Amino acid sequence: MKPIKKISDVSFFRLFEGEAYYTTDGSNPFGMSLHSEEKLLVPDKVCLSQFFPLGDTMLFVKWKEPYTYELNLKTGVERVVRDEAVQAVSEQYINYRNTEKKTNSYVNRTSGTYYVLPYILWGFLPDGGIAEDDTEIFRVDQDGNILWSFPFVDLDEDNIYTPGEVDHIVKILGIVNDLLWFSTQFGRLVALDVATGKVVYQLSGNPADQGKVEYTQVAGLGDCFYRESDRSIVCISYLGFQVIDTSTGDLAESCVFLEEDPDGIGRFDYIYAPNLQGDYFTFLAEMKTDRYGIGRVGIFDLKARKLLWTEEIIPFEERKATRNHLVTSQPLYISGDKLYIKDVKDTLHIFQRE
């Protein structure tokens, strides 16, 4: 990997087909300019993160305006395409928000059909989807009727580290084999039957759950991801990774970094912000001797079980002199043949495969 570009004052970025699109304007956080890696696209008034590249066009929202704009990336022509503000884009749907009516529209990107709900959906189904609030996760149909709900109190508390506090969802991983998988704050992995909302599998790496018959005990789960290629759940911690078979709920594969790759990833004392991308995951790393914050990143090959690449992209001398460093809320991303990561001083670092 070779560094090819640094872009300063990047507030937020998205990746699409090997290129970064980003907003920037440190003096006006609510009316930013929108850029590609090569040029300025929209000079001002773009909301921080409400922009979504879609092939030759870009959907975006302007500050204090209830509309969705479309920008033709080839011609530069900009126009209003909807009187609702775009909120999210997935492979299946585009989500728009009507702030006056407080409703969410979900438009199927293939058929153009849509439905309107008072809920924000985190998972999509042919007749509705999965939503959540502060106390429960539930399934709704396209008319907004709740078909079932699963209260978070049923997850139980953590009576060792946070007694009395109810567990909650950290990440909804996806719907696989008619099961809704999600990970929780207290280190649990849960699968619910999407038809009934009943628990099918519960795994835990939390010491508080040892001895609880309802949980299958595994090593610490860390950060969990859905892997499309084999429809599995991959869980990555600073110690190693585990692969869960979603058809059985069993542990299909595990790896301890210090045993499998002692001279590669195993030599790091701390692994942060793992980010699964296909058969690889990227990460931030530190050793006990490091000072002045995180400066190193790496890529690990899950199939080969070895470190592919690592580099200290913010050297010790720079961290000491400027207090610049990497942060766990900004992981390393792969897009095409490039790598992207943003440091604490809002500089976007771009690398390319040699």
Which residues are covered by each model-predicted region?
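Secretory-pathway ectodomains
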Residues: 1-354
